Design a protein with these regions (language model features):
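Sec-dependent bacterial lipoprotein signal peptides
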Residues: 1-7
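A non-transmembrane, solvent-exposed segment enriched in polar/low-complexity residues
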Residues: 9-166
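Short solvent-exposed coil/turn linkers within tandem alpha-helical repeat scaffolds
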Residues: 174, 178, 213-222
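Amphipathic alpha-helical repeat scaffolds of TPR domains
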Residues: 176-191
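N-terminal "domain-start" segment that seeds a small globular fold
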Residues: 222-256, 363-366
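Conserved redox-active cysteine motifs that mediate thiol-disulfide chemistry
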Residues: 259-260, 267-284
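Structural microenvironment flanking redox-active thiols in thiol-disulfide oxidoreductases
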Residues: 276-315, 325-332, 363
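Thiol/disulfide oxidoreductase modules built on the thioredoxin-like
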Residues: 316-317, 324-370
């Protein structure tokens, strides 16, 4: 409640003042965080050094959220903006990042505490030490030592994942009224989930709308609302978006060309190990439904045709295939976060099932194919 009251008044223009003595630059960038995990940021404003400081005058539409401030969109540090005037002072700078001391924003204190808790409680120091040993062994090409370190590391990573989720959940509950809670939910929970049915989409929408008013003013909330609309378009029961590409002979092939059949649509590429591990199960499915209106369509995001064709021949995956054109947004339209991603489309072109793997590639179509 105290934090909520501190962030309640955000409709005015706010100011970021930065003193970066020791940083060799005459310009700083304010960036929207596209992905903290991948380090992807998009510049939305810049400030020039004047009288020993940089000043950002934020517009009212700048939503409360985590931002990135640095001498480039890829070299800087994270700062929470919450509508308050804040002052940044250079704390430390390395080749990888910039550390800012932040004054005027209570959320930054909470965010810094979260980062420290996350590092400490998920064995950060131990994992860093093991990683250093692993890279040294790799430089020596000592495969035996690399394997030993990898085996020693796995329990820390496995337990670390569990501890991270518990810590994230606790911070979300404590900060549901402010942008930090909803940012943590978006970046560390929502982006790792899938919503294959309209019921799950509705439940998710109700949950994110249970966050406080300040949280719902953040860009994280807006991104989730937008994503849920996209999920509705590719939910089970909806018509599968069209897929267009070139087959192995260079001819155009469309998903709609297979209308009238039950189609397992397999999104994959040649360098995806887990994708190619599904090939035996796909072969079994093709054999199981032989003579029936059943097809498999491989949809590849490969960029090199030879690698794609070689993988098809090496694996013996002799069914319909197409390779997407560069820049095709079909993965986005199907709400795919990772591959392999296999769905079942009915004869009428509607999605019947999603996220199929292994034995499900036979068991699920078996419920429909007659």
């Amino acid at each position: 409640m105290i934090l909520f009251m501190m962030f309640a008044c955000t409709s005015r223009q706010s100011v970021i003042t930065v003193k970066a003595k020791g940083l060799n630059t005459g310009k700083l960038y304010l960036c929207e965080v596209i992905s903290e995990y991948r380090g992807i940021h998009q510049a939305i404003d810049s400030a020039i050094l004047k009288n020993g400081k940089f000043v950002f005058n934020l517009q009212e539409e700048t939503s409360p959220d985590l931002y990135f401030i640095g001498d480039s969109p890829w070299h800087g540090g994270y700062v929470f903006l919450d509508g308050n005037d804040i002052k940044l002072t250079l704390e430390n700078v390395t080749e990888e990042q910039i550390f800012w001391e932040v004054k005027g924003s209570p959320l930054n204190k909470v965010y810094r505490k979260f980062e420290k808790d996350l590092y400490d409680k998920t064995f950060g120091q131990i994992k860093d030490s093991l990683s250093t040993l692993f890279y040294k062994a790799r430089e020596r090409q000592d495969r035996e030592e690399m394997a030993r370190i990898k085996n020693e590391s796995m329990p820390y990573y496995d337990e670390g994942v569990k501890r991270e989720r518990m810590l994230v959940d606790s911070y979300i509950q404590e900060n549901k009224a402010n942008p930090l809670g909803i940012y943590l939910y978006y970046s560390r929970v929502f982006q790792r989930k899938d919503f294959p049915t309209e019921e799950e989409i509705t439940m998710e929408r109700e949950y994110i709308r249970s966050f406080g008013e300040m949280a719902q003013a953040s860009s994280s909330f807006m991104k989730m609302e937008k994503d849920l609309l996209r999920y509705e378009d590719c939910a089970i029961g909806h018509e599968a978006p069209e897929i267009i590409g070139k087959d192995t002979l260079g001819n155009e092939l469309r998903l709609s060309d297979l209308r009238g059949n039950y189609v397992l649509v397999d999104f994959w590429n040649s360098y995806c190990h887990w994708c190619r591990e599904e090939t035996p199960a796909l072969k079994q499915a093709l054999e199981h439904f032989a003579g029936k209106n059943f097809k498999i369509l491989g949809v590849s995001s490969d960029r090199v045709k030879k690698l794609w064709l070689d993988a098809i021949h090496e694996d013996g995956s002799y069914w319909d295939h197409l390779m997407l054109e560069k820049g095709d947004d079909v993965m986005d339209r199907y709400c795919i976060k990772g591959i392999p991603h296999i769905i079942l489309v009915g004869p009428d072109g509607k999605i019947l099932a999603k996220e199929l793997r292994g034995q499900d590639l036979i068991d699920v179509p078996d419920k429909f194919v007659k």
